[in-house]
Structure formats: C-alpha cells, structure tokens
C-alpha cells in the first residue's frame, strides 16, 4: 500500500539514520582466535545503509502522463507514419524535457521505477509493421537489428541517454513485423529486451460489425500466436482496432473461446489527450487516451504538460504517492 505525502504539508528537509547498539570504534569486537589447523572465522560485513532519496520539491504523482501512439516507422513522414529522422528527434526531445520511457502495464501496475524528478512517457506501436522491428543480415549471413527500425533506434537512444530508459508497448496483429521466417524469434527477442507485447487482435476487425463471439475468437487467435513464441505470456493491454470498442466494452476485456481465456487490464483508444495517473480519480483503465505522434500534436501536448500542476513528476519512491496539496481532491479513493 502506498503512503501519501502532501508536499505543502510535510516536505522533509533532512533524514537522519540512527544506528542503535553500535559499539564505538575503539571497542570494536576483535576477530576470534582459532586453534591451529582450523579454518578462520569469517565475520560478516556490516549492513549497508541506503542513501536517502533526494527530495523532489515539485513532485506531482497525480499529474498527466503522455501515451504516444505510433504506427509505421519509415523513411518519409506520412499519414499514420513517422519518419525515421523524426522518431529519433522525438526521443531526443523527450529526454531533454525530462521524460523516461516506461512500459504501459509496468507503470500502471506500479512496477516501473521512474527516476526522481523525471516524468513517465509510454510509447505505443500499433499494427506490428516491419519498420518497428526489422532484422538485417551481415556479410556472414548473421542477423542483427536494423539500426533504422524503431527497436534499433530505441536501443541507440538508450545507449546515448540512459536516463531515457528502454521501453515500449507493441500492439500486435497476425504475422507480426513482416519477415515471416523470423516472427517467433522476434517476439521472444522483444520480451528479452524488456519490451511489452500487447494485442491489436489478429485480423484488425471493426468491433462494431462483428459478433461478440467473433471478437473473442479474434483476440484468442492473436494470443495463441504469441504463445507459440513466448509460451504463457500474459497480454495485459489491447489497442482497440480503429479506436472502436464493442457495444459491450467488457467483451474485449476478458472472456474465452474454445477453452482459451484472455484477460486484459487496459483498453487503448486512438486519441486524443494525455492520460490520467494511476492514482487519479479520473483514471479509467478501460478507456486509455493516446496522443498521435505527429509534429503538431506532440508539440501542442508536450508544451501543455509543462504548465503548472499538469505533468506527472516522480518522487523516485514507488511506495509513496507524492502530490501538491492543490490536487488533494483528485486522488482516487480506495475501497
């Protein structure tokens, strides 16, 4: 359970660690003598004292969180396509603005650690196109990650700016990332790198044009495909195809088909604003907004988030919820 800290009421100025029953230096316990031929007694090292986390005076863990939506990563900018150059610039911009990449489910489950004073940002990728994750072959025929695909660019950015982090949530369709001979290897590789796999359904249907059972069947078909590569992988999030939910939204949340069950914690929309923090009263995990990654929308919303009390800023402690007292009424009430 998280502890709550209201900044205006109890900003901690100093932390003192008191060690009880510790003998003075001159009275340190000598190493016991042992009979000849006996192994020496190894004294345990003294326990480490963890350094206290820095106090982040502007921490706001009820602030808004940008969840960015990408589709194709290609040479030229276009509709539903981000150019390779612009994607690189997006990551540089996010780093310089103080953001750290987190996987969707890790952050909203409270498992992602955002460094103190930095802000979380979730990158999502729909449609599992080849430009998101591509293999190339060297002269010896060995595979390597294309440095101009999304995964390659993310790895390069992380090497340049470790505080940016390495994360991303990829919403898969059937036959993900092209290169059909490598798709299973790619899914396992992505999980090994720490990325999150989400569902975008197998065939990307219009949910409002098919039956509930057809929806369940399509979701399960994608899940079974993922299990071929990563057995038992729990898909936590589903991006609604075309941003259209079923008439009964819960049909896409959990269910089963032919004895195979699925259970999603998060449903992703197509637009169109920053998301609410996990502990905000308006956070709705079954309708998570995203920001399309275009020059206009990124500039507009990232500038907006720089306004007072708008942006999530981490205190660095996952066990404590810190926020300005002006937002006291915005905290989600726990039952």
Show which residues each predicted segment covers.
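Hydrophobic membrane-insertion alpha-helices, especially the h-region
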Residues: 6-18
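Generic enzyme active-site microenvironment
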Residues: 124, 171, 198
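Substrate-binding clefts and substrate-entry loops adjacent to catalytic sites
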Residues: 198-209
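C-terminal active-site subregion of NodB/CE4 polysaccharide deacetylases
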Residues: 30-124, 129-137, 142-145, 209-335
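Positively charged n-region of N-terminal signal peptides that target proteins for export
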Residues: 1-4
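Acidic (Asp/Glu)-rich catalytic clusters
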Residues: 58-60, 114, 154-165, 179-198, ...
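Hydrophobic single-pass membrane-insertion segments
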Residues: 17-28
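A short alpha/beta connector and helix-capping loop motif
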Residues: 134-159, 168-170
